[in-house]
């Protein structure tokens, strides 16, 4: 296989749940090409061909650039072109819900796929308008503003996500709790990151306001309410998964059967990429950027990863990250990374967060108890725990870095 062919094979057969928010879009094409060459070298070094389930961790917008680099390389080398009748990979990306949404489909009809993609992207935007805490007038903004007073009308979609969040809360003993948003403003890990570590005097008054059981959903009336003033809901830990599930339904209704939808650390893979399953990778939590420690082939399944290495800051040698334990109001300290495989991305999105907070042994016990759920946990001590259903399926490429 030529270098150009290997590059094309790598890009077209791989997917990772670790593509996060758009950044570095101005990186030069030369650096992109170097990254591809480096990736091919890594594959050869560990005895893997590029068809193995690994890929570069990069913003989704860069995936398109990398693909262009490789296509140009193939042309320069005189590689064969794909006929219009032959199936191939169609890919598009758009920013929604604060991150890059990437959709790929293996199909013979590019025009029909792109039309379906647009409908799926529009659904992300529609749900964002309902669930965002940043948009005035959204269902969640109105729910938060009315906390401790009256129930407010909310859409059926928001009620479905709230019901799903409460189910995951029950499974995890409250470790996953969308009312953790009562802590908002104390910790800053997004564009407003400032390295401030709130003290107990700041955190303690907020903790009684975190209680998923004080969230009431009335499907008959079409309303939701929060019992106490100061309570807040944030669906950032489950909303993207729900949006992916909705997008999957749209793509299937459009007649697509082989596709992948990805938003941040969450994805759903339907069917296959040609004659192979889709391949996903798990990032090494303490490794260099773009380094994976494990990989997995999946089909017709959801996959989500939560980790302490994306949104964080270091102060006085201690890592502070965005996954907060609702019992302490501080960053959870028992895990480095949790990946969950299940049938629904709504479930994998919320459960990966809840299991991350539970930690290794308790989290794995929950995974083993839940039907149709598998998982991989990298504990705070850097132990790798693999659920029974993934043993023999998960390819561990290296030990996670210390």
Kindly label every feature range from the protein language model:
Residues 1-65:
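Intrinsic disorder/low-complexity segments
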Residues 3, 10, 29, 37, ...:
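Mature catalytic core of soluble alpha/beta enzymes
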């Amino acid at each position: 296989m030529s270098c150009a062919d290997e590059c094309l094979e790598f890009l077209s057969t791989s997917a990772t749940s670790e593509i996060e928010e758009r950044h570095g879009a101005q990186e030069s094409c030369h650096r992109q090409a170097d990254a591809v060459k480096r990736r091919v070298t890594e594959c050869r070094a560990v005895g893997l061909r590029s068809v193995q389930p690994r890929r570069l961790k990069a913003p989704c917008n860069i995936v398109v650039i990398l693909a262009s680099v490789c296509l140009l390389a193939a042309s320069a080398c005189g590689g064969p072109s794909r006929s219009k009748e032959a199936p191939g990979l169609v890919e598009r990306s758009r920013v929604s819900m604060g991150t890059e949404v990437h959709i790929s489909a293996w199909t013979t009809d590019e025009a029909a796929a792109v039309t379906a993609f647009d409908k799926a992207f529009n659904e992300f935007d529609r749900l964002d308008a309902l669930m965002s805490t940043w948009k005035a007038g959204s269902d969640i903004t109105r729910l938060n503003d009315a906390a401790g007073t009256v129930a407010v009308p909310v859409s059926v979609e928001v009620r479905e996500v709230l019901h799903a969040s409460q189910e995951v809360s029950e499974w995890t003993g409250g470790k996953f709790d969308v009312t953790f948003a009562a802590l908002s403003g104390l910790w800053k890990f997004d564009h407003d990151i400032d390295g401030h570590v709130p003290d107990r005097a700041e955190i303690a008054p907020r903790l009684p306001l975190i209680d998923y059981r004080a969230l009431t959903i009335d499907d008959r009336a079409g309303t939701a309410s929060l019992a106490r003033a100061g309570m807040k809901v944030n669906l950032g830990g489950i909303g993207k998964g729900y949006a992916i599930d909705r997008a999957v339904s749209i793509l299937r209704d459009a007649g697509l059967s082989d596709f992948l939808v990805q938003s941040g650390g969450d994805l759903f893979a339907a069917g296959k990429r040609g004659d192979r399953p889709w391949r996903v990778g798990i990032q090494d939590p303490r490794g260099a950027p773009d380094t994976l420690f494990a990989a997995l082939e999946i089909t017709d399944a959801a996959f989500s990863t939560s980790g302490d290495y994306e949104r964080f800051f270091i102060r006085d040698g201690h890592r502070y990250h965005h996954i907060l334990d609702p019992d302490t109001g501080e960053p959870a300290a028992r895990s480095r990374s949790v990946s969950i495989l299940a049938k629904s991305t709504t479930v994998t999105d919320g459960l990966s967060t809840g299991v991350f907070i539970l930690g290794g042994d308790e989290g794995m016990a929950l995974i083993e108890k839940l039907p149709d759920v598998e998982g991989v946990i990298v504990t705070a001590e850097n132990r790798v725990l693999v659920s029974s259903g993934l043993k023999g399926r998960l390819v561990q490429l290296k030990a996670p870095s210390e």
